[in-house]
Amino acid sequence: IAWRRWLHQHPEISFEEFETTAFILERLKAFGGFEISRPAKTGVVAALDTKKPGRTIALRADIDALPIREDNALPYKSMRDGVMHACGHDGHTAILLGTACTLSKISEDLAGRILLIFQHAEEQPPGGAIELYKAGVMEGVDEIYGLHLSSAYPSGVFGIRPGVLTAAT
């Protein structure tokens, strides 16, 4: 929760996620076990290679915020006037960081390669995904999974289905 709240207080718009990137890097380095790369000026890709045969699975979270003013009295509201995490990317990033922490602890029990993609600039066309693709991030990936927070479900419940869900591109 502390990670999510810090991220919520420090939102950054697409292609300007410098503090967010530094925050992610600091935690990934502390967890250990990841090969970390920066294929673009913001965003992070962390690879966990178990050295055992298996598939390459990618997990992706978006890290950018929106140019919207947050108008509430939450103790962790945005500290940047006119910019906020209105779409849940602070939660997505915190969830992927939590996943990274857990994976680093159980890596000996895993097989294959796991790629954690902290994608910059999801909200602003042409989007950071294109830069990552052109940099070769998706080469060798067998499957990729993402998530999106939704107020349509009560806390503790998640929705899942085969195929594409909530994808705009």
List the predicted regions and their residue ranges.
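Acidic/His- and Gly-rich active-site-bordering loop/insert found
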Residues: I1-H85, A94-L97, C101-A111
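Histidine/acidic-residue-rich, glycine-tolerant segments that coordinate divalent metal ions
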Residues: V45, L66-I68, A73-M84, G91, ...
